[in-house]
């Protein structure tokens, strides 16, 4: 067995710079030899169970004594697995009452001493529940039977107790207890609310809170003093059952029994009955098994026929029924059992005022508070209901049943990918060098590099996928017709003319933006002229041959070059007067053949430079993509023209990326750089494109014929701008003066880190992996969440394994990632089958961070080769905090927040150039003011969220919805109202209220004051920072000469230039953060306003009709204009 976190890289073809933390499982056996960061930390063996640690998502804690006793667990083949705590294996909701629990079993006394690694080692068991939860009645029944829960106390002690609901549903009891039985209970009528997660003072201040899963924790708030009973379930399933059941009891009180009897979801039952009757046209009262199975499959296409048949047979067997006819009652029972997703039911009841369906207002609340949808109204809600609700009754009444809600959540409307990015959404008017360009290497090959066949289908496929740079390796062919193949190899040949014809047909099939033909020319003068004839005749005026403007400093934009084809190739020098001349030959194929037998790889600079004859006609087709040889960065900065392009072998590019990352980034701000795979990758494996994107390299050529992790990254990355083949690089890679190191393992100066919160809830309809072992149809899935980006962002987390359930596994595990450069980050979901011999690939989905939609989302899984897997998906929840907000992420709890004295302020560096240092010195006060405004606002908002009983992931609309029930008295008269007549909504007490509510109102007032301070002072502070930035930029052009006059030499002068760049980056970043914080604050005020109106808490007559609907919380804020940057 291999420990998670050990192990080597996936068998790469060559060593490269350390890549993201991606395991061999993450590499998914995708192309033998995938290197360049594709290896990562995970070994091929099974993960080791670490009995001392706690899995996020597993609700057991490290224990000792009798409670730590573990018994061997049998796998599906009867193989004994590593011992696991019994609390891990969940057969829910039916649990036998424990007979021998110790009376006071404190399992951990001092959590602060329980130090554990952040990297978890997991392979936990999670067996399917015995019965699906599909209604409130199921939850109540489970609670009456009882469950073992862990009771958390403020003294860092945790007690095992058996909790159950009294049969009369009036009290919540637990046993054993030191108290007598009458005191070890809470009256249901005294319960104020039920909170999910670790959102009480006891959880936040508890020393072992970090070892408790957020998904398994919940709290019962009861009594006039709002005391909390803090509990931890053995699984998120059990926690959901208790939370749902208790909330139902609170809502209906003494009427619960009546509601349960009358709320067996009559609308749903009627609809399913109607489906049955449409088949039973003769009113026989039964239908054939075949018809019953087909009907359920039509209603839920993802279900397997074998599973439906098995369920009917099990039902008949339990009734000792002969024959295969299916009655209406049996049909309804099986439909409910197979087509109810408990995780979606639990979500529905959170927002349903009826507890069995969503009306238009419930749906509006869900869309606004959870999904971040702006400008929502009842008409839009009705449209959604009419589109997705299957029952006619629901459509007529405006009700969305569990089936309609499931249909909606599984529709493309709720996919994780933001539909705004399905079209071109970026500025396409910047220089060509400011974009990443989707690029193909040896496009003509459809297999390996040495013996594989060449085919025009390679060009068709690449162009249809949005590729904007293809390669043509052209050689002399028979009958005076040039051919394309990899020279010095045994690859087959295709005629040049047929390739140009295909390019003409498909060049702009997927994108209207310019296509680059990377021409590697090895032809004689005679056949070069034939090439020119073919290109001119077939491509015509699509060819861009305009001479570059020597007065310009940057390449034209993709917008200007729409519909144009650029030739990247060698070009004769301007002083060549003849009809032909000689140029250097950059032959990738020759390099490969030279290296094939060499064990030690030399650098490309050691390969002898050859020269060949180039005809003038072909040279004249080359305009702004003239191929030149790279020498060194300082030479390029001085002599290279903006229209000249250098190509880098992967090995050489990796060397520069590791040794000269700053120079490489600066070089790519002005010039195009093409990186092609090492010639040693004869199997057509791919390098990691992120290794070179992080340095700003625009044209990273990929072997499109080889699927796997690296192509997943490439395909996923270029989806973010309408799949047009061009993606605008991060601002920090484009701005003339900016400080950025490609290999940073810390936060990026001037860029706000953001926290990505991902909860993997469930999976649906996972197919059996191709070529997997002899396990029949058994699938034991688990999920990896990977972050790809700069080294500081590369990370991965995995869920537990759910054994023998590929149809509807429940994971319920939450992960958190800090993203330091969001514009270059990608998220990859990988589903694997936990096979005993080698984990098999099931599916994956890769998405740029900037394309994530927050809220509850489905992730459509794709196969190894990129095809969508029918009906296979992950159900996840996504939240992003500190997005455009700035500052380091806050830790949990009030006690760890930093006051002004301990607050960390952005620091500026000293250049030791007096005049320049004076300017930067003047920037320190506004930087401090900006930090104080932002952090005071953030701290106040977090304090209010905590008092509302929510985590920092929640938004203020959710906070207002959560706290609104507390503001109502026993007769539903408001104890607190919001005055919305002014810009800053105020809370007003209505008579005498409990101290707990006074505390909420006081905290709310403090939050409003911090929001007000930021809004009213942000503009002035922003202008001061921008003014200092502009003043400093006046020294930029002559900084070297000024430093020399000050006596700085060589190293110190270079250090001064670096410090100047750092300071400018910090100033720009601080200005941006303040601007974003103001936008966030205005959004917060809008959310408060509309939540108050939605809950009916606004003071009559104070609603401000002029307030606009809140923008989507993730709406991209436009970048500042260049005149604000001081450039």
Curated annotation (Swiss-Prot):
Phosphoserine PTM sites in chain numbering: 17, 1113
Record localization: Cytoplasm
Record-annotated PI-PLC X-box domain positions: 426-570
InterPro entries in UniProt: C2_dom (IPR000008), C2_domain_sf (IPR035892), EF-hand-dom_pair (IPR011992), PH-like_dom_sf (IPR011993), PH_domain (IPR001849), PI-PLC_fam (IPR001192), PLC-like_Pdiesterase_TIM-brl (IPR017946), PLC_EF-hand-like (IPR015359)
UniProt entry tagged with the keyword Chaperone: no
Domain PH, first and last residues per copy: 141-251
Any single GO CC term annotated in Swiss-Prot or TrEMBL for this entry: cytoplasm
Disordered, as annotated region: 1-128, 1101-1127
Biased composition (Low complexity): 19-31
Residues found modified as N-acetylalanine: 2
Phosphothreonine found at: 84, 584
UniProt keyword annotation of Cytoplasm present: yes
Compositionally biased tracts (Basic and acidic residues): 1106-1127
Residue ranges occupied by any PI-PLC Y-box domain in the UniProt entry: 618-734
Gly residues compositional bias, start-end: 1-11, 32-42
GO biological process: B cell proliferation involved in immune response; B-1a B cell differentiation; gamma-aminobutyric acid signaling pathway; negative regulation of B cell receptor signaling pathway; negative regulation of cold-induced thermogenesis; phosphatidylinositol metabolic process; phosphatidylinositol-mediated signaling; regulation of synaptic transmission, GABAergic
Classification via Gene3D superfamilies: C2 domain, EF-hand, Phosphatidylinositol (PI) phosphodiesterase, Pleckstrin-homology domain (PH domain)/Phosphotyrosine-binding domain (PTB)
Biological function: May play an role in the regulation of Ins(1,4,5)P3 around the endoplasmic reticulum.
UniProt-recorded name of the protein: Inactive phospholipase C-like protein 2
Gene: PLCL2
């Amino acid at each position: 067995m291999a420990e998670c976190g050990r192990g080597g890289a996936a068998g790469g073809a060559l060593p490269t710079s350390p890549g993201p933390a991606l395991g061999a499982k993450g590499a998914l056996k995708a192309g033998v030899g995938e290197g360049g960061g594709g290896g990562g930390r995970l070994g091929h063996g099974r993960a080791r169970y670490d009995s001392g640690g706690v899995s996020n998502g597993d609700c057991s804690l490290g224990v000792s004594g009798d409670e730590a006793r573990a018994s061997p667990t049998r796998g599906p083949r009867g193989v004994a697995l590593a011992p696991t705590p019994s609390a891990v294996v969940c057969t829910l909701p039916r649990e036998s009452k424990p007979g021998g629990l110790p009376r006071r079993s404190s399992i951990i006394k001092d959590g602060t001493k329980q130090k554990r690694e952040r990297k978890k080692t997991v392979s936990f068991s999670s067996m399917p529940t015995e019965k699906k939860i599909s209604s409130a009645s199921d939850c109540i029944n489970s609670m009456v039977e009882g469950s073992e829960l862990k009771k958390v106390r403020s003294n860092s002690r945790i007690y095992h107790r058996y909790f159950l609901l009294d049969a009369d549903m009036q009290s919540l009891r637990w046993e054993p207890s030191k108290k007598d039985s009458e005191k070890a209970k809470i009256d249901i009528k005294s319960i104020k609310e039920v909170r999910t997660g670790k959102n009480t003072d006891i959880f936040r201040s508890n020393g072992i809170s970090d070892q408790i899963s957020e998904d398994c924790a919940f709290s019962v708030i009861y009594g006039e003093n709002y005391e909390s009973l803090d509990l931890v379930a053995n699984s998120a399933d059990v926690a959901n059952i208790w939370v749902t059941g208790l909330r139902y009891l609170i809502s209906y009180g003494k009427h619960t029994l009546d509601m349960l009897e009358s709320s067996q979801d009559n609308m749903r039952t009627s609809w399913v009955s109607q489906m049955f009757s449409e088949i039973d046209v003769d009113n026989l009262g039964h239908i054939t098994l075949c018809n019953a199975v087909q009907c359920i499959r039509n209603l839920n296409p993802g279900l397997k026929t074998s599973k439906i048949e098995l369920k009917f047979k099990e039902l008949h067997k339990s009734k000792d029924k002969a024959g295969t006819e299916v009655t209406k009652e049996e049909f309804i029972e099986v439909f409910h059992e197979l087509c109810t997703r408990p995780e979606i039911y639990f979500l529905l009841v959170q927002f349903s005022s009826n507890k069995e369906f969503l009306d238009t207002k419930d749906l509006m609340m869900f869309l606004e508070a959870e999904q971040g949808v702006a400008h929502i109204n009842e008409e839009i809600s009705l449209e959604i209901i009419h589109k997705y609700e299957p029952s006619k009754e629901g459509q007529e009444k405006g009700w969305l049943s569990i089936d309609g809600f499931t249909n909606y959540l599984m529709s493309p409307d709720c996919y994780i990918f933001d539909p705004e990015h399905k079209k071109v959404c970026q500025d396409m008017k910047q220089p060509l060098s400011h974009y990443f360009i989707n690029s193909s290497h040896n496009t003509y090959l459809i297999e390996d590099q040495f013996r594989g066949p060449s085919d025009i289908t390679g060009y068709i496929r690449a162009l249809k996928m949005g590729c904007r740079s293809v390669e043509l390796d052209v050689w002399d062919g028979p009958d005076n017709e040039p051919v394309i193949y990899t020279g010095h190899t045994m690859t087959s040949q295709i005629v040049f003319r047929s390739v140009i014809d295909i390019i003409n047909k498909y060049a702009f099939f997927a994108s209207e933006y310019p296509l680059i033909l990377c021409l590697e020319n090895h032809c004689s003068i005679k056949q070069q002229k034939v090439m020119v004839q073919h290109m001119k005749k077939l491509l015509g005026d699509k060819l861009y041959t305009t001479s570059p403007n020597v007065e310009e400093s940057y390449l034209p934009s993709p917008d200007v070059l729409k519909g144009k084809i650029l030739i990247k190739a060698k070009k004769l020098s301007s002083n060549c007067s003849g009809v032909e001349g000689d140029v250097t030959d950059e032959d990738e194929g020759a390099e490969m053949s030279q290296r094939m037998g060499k064990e030690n790889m030399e650098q490309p600079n050691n390969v002898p430079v050859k020269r060949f004859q180039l005809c003038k006609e072909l040279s004249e087709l080359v305009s702004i993509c003239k191929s030149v040889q790279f020498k060194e960065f300082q030479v390029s900065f001085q002599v290279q023209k903006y229209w000249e392009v250098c190509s880098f072998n992967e090995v050489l590019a990796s060397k520069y990326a590791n040794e000269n990352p700053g120079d490489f980034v600066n070089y790519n701000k002005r010039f195009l750089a093409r990186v092609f795979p090492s010639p040693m990758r004869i199997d057509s494996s791919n390098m990691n494109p992120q290794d070179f994107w992080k340095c700003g390299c625009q044209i990273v050529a990929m072997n499109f014929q080889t699927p796997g992790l690296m192509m997943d990254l490439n395909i996923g990355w270029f989806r973010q701008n309408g799949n047009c083949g061009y993606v605008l690089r991060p601002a920090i890679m484009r701005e003339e003066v900016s400080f950025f190191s490609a290999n940073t393992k810390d936060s990026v100066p001037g860029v706000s880190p953001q926290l990505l919160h991902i909860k993997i809830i469930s999976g649906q309809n996972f197919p059996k992996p191709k070529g997997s072992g002899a396990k029949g149809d058994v699938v034991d899935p688990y999920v990896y969440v990977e972050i790809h980006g700069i080294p500081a962002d590369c990370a991965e987390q995995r869920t537990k394994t759910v054994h023998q359930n590929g149809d509807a596994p429940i994971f319920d595990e939450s992960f958190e990632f800090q993203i330091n450069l969001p514009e270059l980050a990608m998220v990859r979901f990988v589903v694997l089958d936990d096979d005993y011999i080698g984990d098999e690939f099931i599916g994956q989905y890769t998405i740029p961070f900037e394309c994530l939609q927050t809220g509850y989302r489905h992730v459509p899984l794709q196969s190894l080769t990129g095809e969508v897997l029918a009906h296979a998906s992950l159900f996840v929840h996504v939240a992003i905090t500190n997005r455009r907000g700035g500052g380091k992420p806050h830790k949990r709890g009030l006690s760890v927040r930093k006051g002004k004295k301990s607050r960390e302020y952005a620091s500026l560096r000293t250049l030791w150039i007096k005049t320049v240092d004076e300017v930067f010195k003047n920037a320190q006060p506004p930087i401090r003011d900006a930090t104080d405004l932002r952090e005071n606002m953030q701290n106040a908002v977090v304090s209010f969220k905590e008092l509302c009983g929510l985590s920092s992931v929640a938004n203020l609309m959710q906070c207002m919805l959560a706290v609104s029930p507390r503001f109502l008295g026993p007769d539903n008269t408001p104890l607190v109202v919001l005055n919305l007549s002014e810009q800053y909504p105020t809370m007003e007490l209505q008579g005498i209220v409990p101290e707990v509510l006074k505390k909420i109102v006081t905290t709310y007032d403090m939050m409003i004051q911090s929001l007000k301070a930021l809004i009213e002072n942000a503009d002035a502070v922003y202008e001061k920072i921008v003014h200092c930035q502009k003043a400093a930029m006046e020294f930029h052009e002559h900084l070297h000469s000024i430093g020399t006059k000050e006596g700085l030499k060589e190293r110190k002068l270079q250090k001064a230039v670096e410090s100047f760049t750092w300071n400018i980056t910090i100033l720009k970043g601080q200005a941006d953060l303040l601007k974003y914080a103001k936008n966030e604050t205005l959004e917060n005020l809008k959310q408060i306003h509309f939540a108050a109106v939605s809950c009916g808490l606004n003071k009559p007559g104070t609603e401000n009709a002029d307030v606009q609907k809140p923008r989507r919380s993730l709406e991209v804020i436009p970048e500042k204009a260049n005149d604000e940057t001081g450039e």
